[in-house]
Swiss-Prot record:
Residues engaged in binding GTP: 296-303, 373-377, 435-438
Protein name as catalogued: Eukaryotic peptide chain release factor GTP-binding subunit
GO MF annotation: an example: GTPase activity
Region (G5): 476-478
Localization annotation: Cytoplasm
Cross-referenced PROSITE patterns: G_TR_1, G_TR_2
Biological source species: Candida maltosa (Yeast)
GO cellular component: cytoplasm
Disordered: region residues: 1-64, 76-115, 132-162, 184-256
Residue ranges of the region described as G2: 352-356
Sorted UniProt keywords: Cytoplasm, GTP-binding, Nucleotide-binding, Phosphoprotein, Protein biosynthesis, Repeat
Gene: SUP35
Length: 712
């Protein structure tokens, strides 16, 4: 190597390979043994043109490979090359012909023109078209190339560089060789199997859709695994994280590349957004979430029962309850201390009346629960409706104490109205809890229990509850008998059924649309270093950073933080859960209860006019066209006007009358067109029951219930 010409050729070789010797040390050894090197060639070559990459000796080096490898043809190219990093794998993935030279000043085209038999732009089945003899002839010809020939070839190269290159995608087939396919602009070829940050999605769908994109199917040695190297050297504008299949494209075609990448990214995101229900179960230790609402007449014992359940399940510690007991005693409200767990504000504690819907959270061994404690007073029925719209199961608390049951159930009492409103708001399962059974006037009497449940059972069936969906049980909210543990057989030998929590833990679960389009009616709002909305997710799931639309204003918002039932931050929340979301993009004063957060792809519909089927349950006079009242639809409260009565429905058959009725009165079922003054978020009852049922109220009483049949 002391010869200066040898030194010069070595330097040039180093410059052309530019650091690839470290990756491929085996290339350098044949170089020193080459008998073909012609120093005159090296002197004739002018490096100042910036074409240091063109090295005839480089081809001789590859020629050396050919001669070596023709001896191995008996074992097949593929096996031999696969074991040694392979011609195609090695060069394609580790700075090979196409990618490496493409990045280094277009050496690729030169190689292509000289090796016409080996053309990566055509889809050959493996190596059949690769002819080493022809290759060697061409190499020997190319060594005697003059400078003029070289310049001519260079001009051709420039021209070919300006042509739009065909975008390539690597497909790893089940065989050990890798084929370069001409990728068309179909999404399938560029479709990523799943992004690196993909949430645990159901993988069988992806696998069946594109088996060739599975990396596992190719037994490639780790050192030459295709993805990382290609990601280093590919110049195309492809996002690394979302495309594990390396796509090879020349710089002249960034537009088509980015277009297909966008669709591929969208597909990846869609797959990422799918959530496996099994994974969700594992996440919460197999516990699903149930919202329960305590409802019933004022003083039936709803808050006391809720407070006692929280104490019995360990959600409220003993010290807190003892503190409430002392405070209640000082205030002369000794028997109310358990209700103070639920009724937190001063006014509620002084009057012993719940005013707003109290919320609390507890957990058993099998499930997670949110208690919604509805106010029993008729002044606060609208709050109760908002609470019922978020509940899965209704617990109707009735007092067995003499006089109290009658007050609650007879005219003017709230027991009937609450049961009706719960049914209208989609609470299809109702547990009738006969409370205060330990009272001296009752003393666990079976006769009194049956008297209470029989009357109420007839009424509940009349408003549409199935026999199987009505469950009765005797309890004492104050002593806790029948809440967590079963009632003591000494006190109550005639009841052998489950306790309240035992029944809740073992009842059938609701069908949740975890992968449906996201929908969450806003039930409350607040300002807490930003805008916070709360509500129950009716469909779909949400993650931090998700972009949503707030309807009906069509305001785009971003989810910054998710708070779950226990007020802790969470990364995701699923259908059926009660959550608070901190959102960006809207001011607190610009939204109100009844607005709906929805996914941008499937936004909830907004209407001012719709057709509905209405059953009139309580109406002192009659109603006709132009009648106005208040409508409660999910969490929205709007004034509504009857624009047109279209049909009367016959009792029993539900057949429509041909003539529109002139008026409607109590007990009638009608189809009418209603109009609201402001746009309201609604869906038909058939598509989304939660957003398609409503209650009509007038002068403090519920006059009708209805479901939307058509949006106009």
């Amino acid at each position: 190597m002391s010869n200066p010409q040898d030194q010069l050729s070595n330097d040039l070789a180093n410059a052309s390979i530019s650091g690839d010797q470290s990756k491929q040390p085996q290339q350098q050894q044949p170089q020193q043994q080459q008998p073909y090197f012609n120093p005159n060639q090296a002197q004739a070559f002018v490096p100042t043109g910036g074409y240091q990459q063109f090295q005839p000796q480089q081809q001789q080096q590859y020629g050396g490979y050919q001669q070596n490898y023709t001896q191995y043809q008996a074992g097949g190219y593929q096996q031999n090359y696969n074991n040694r990093g392979g011609y195609q794998q090695n060069y394609n993935n580790r700075g090979g012909y196409q990618q490496n030279y493409n990045n280094r000043g277009g050496y690729q085209q030169q190689q292509q023109q000289q090796y016409q038999a080996y053309n990566p732009n055509q889809q050959y089945g493996g190596y059949q078209a690769y002819n080493p003899q022809q290759q060697q002839q061409q190499q020997t010809q190319s060594q005697g190339m003059s400078l003029a020939d070289f310049q001519k070839q260079k001009a051709e190269q420039q021209a070919s560089l300006n042509k739009p290159a065909v975008k390539k995608t690597l497909k790893l087939a089940s065989s050990s060789g890798i084929k370069l396919a001409n990728a068309t602009k179909k999404v399938d070829t560029a479709k990523p199997a799943a992004s690196k940050e993909a949430s645990p999605a159901p993988k069988d769908e992806e696998a069946s859709a594109e088996p060739e994109a599975k990396k596992e199917s190719t037994p490639v040695p780790a050192s030459s695994s295709p993805a990382p190297a290609a990601a280093d050297s590919t110049p195309a504008p492809v996002k690394k994280e979302s495309t594990p299949t390396p796509s090879v494209a020349s710089k002249s075609a960034p537009v088509s590349a980015s277009a297909s990448v966008v669709t591929a990214d969208a597909l990846a995101k869609e797959q990422e957004d799918e959530v496996d229900e099994e994974v969700v179960k594992d996440m919460f230790g197999g516990k699903d979430h149930v919202s329960i609402i305590f409802m019933g007449h004022v003083d039936a014992g709803k808050s006391t029962m809720g407070g006692n359940i929280l104490y019995l399940t360990g959600s409220v510690d003993k010290r807190t309850v003892e503190k409430y007991e002392r405070e209640a005693k000082d205030a002369g409200r000794q028997g109310w201390y358990l209700s103070w767990v639920m009724d937190t504000n001063k006014e509620e504690r002084n009057d012993g009346k719940t005013i707003e819907v109290g919320k609390a959270y507890f957990e058993t061994d099998k499930r997670r629960y949110t208690i919604l404690d509805a106010p029993g007073h008729k002044m606060y029925v609208s709050e109760m409706i908002g609470g019922a719209s978020q509940a899965d199961v209704g617990i109707l608390v009735i007092s067995a104490r003499k006089g109290e049951y009658e007050t609650g159930f007879e005219k003017g009492g709230q027991t009937r109205e609450h049961a009706l409103l719960a049914k209208t708001q989609g609470v299809n399962k109702i547990i009738v809890v006969v409370n205060k059974m330990d009272d001296p006037t009752v003393n666990w009497s079976k006769e009194r229990y049956q008297e209470c449940t029989t009357k109420l059972g007839v009424f509940l069936k009349g408003i549409g509850y199935n026999k199987d969906d009505i469950i009765n049980m005797p309890v004492s909210g104050y002593t806790g008998a029948g809440l967590k543990d079963r009632v003591n057989p000494k006190d109550c030998p005639w009841y052998e059924g489950p306790s309240l929590l035992e029944y809740l833990d073992n009842m059938d679960t609701m069908n949740r649309k975890i992968n449906g389009p996201f929908m969450m009616p806003v039930s409350g709002k607040m300002k807490d270093l930003g805008t916070v909305v709360e509500g129950k997710i009716e469909s779909g799931h949400v993650k931090k950073g998700t972009n949503l639309i707030l309807m009906p204003n069509k305001t785009p918002v971003e989810v910054l933080t998710i708070y779950n039932e226990t007020e802790q931050e969470a990364d995701t929340a699923f259908s059926g859960e009660q959550v608070r979301l901190k959102i960006k993009g809207v001011e607190e004063e610009d939204l109100q209860p009844g607005y709906v957060l929805t996914s941008p792809k499937n936004p909830v519909k907004t209407v001012t006019k719709f057709e509905a089927q209405i059953a009139i349950v309580e109406l002192k006079s009659i109603l006709s066209n132009g009648f106005s009242c208040v409508m409660h639809l999910h969490t929205a409260i709007e004034e509504v006007k009857f624009v047109e009565l279209k049909h009367k429905l016959e009792k029993g058959t539900n057949r429509k009358s041909k003539k529109p009725p002139a008026f409607a009165k109590k007990g009638m079922k009608i189809i009418a067109i209603l109009e609201v003054s402001e746009p309201v978020c609604a869906e038909t009852y058939k598509d989304y029951p939660q957003l398609g049922r409503f209650t009509l109220r007038d002068q403090g009483t519920t006059i009708a219930i209805g479901k939307i049949t058509k949006l106009l």
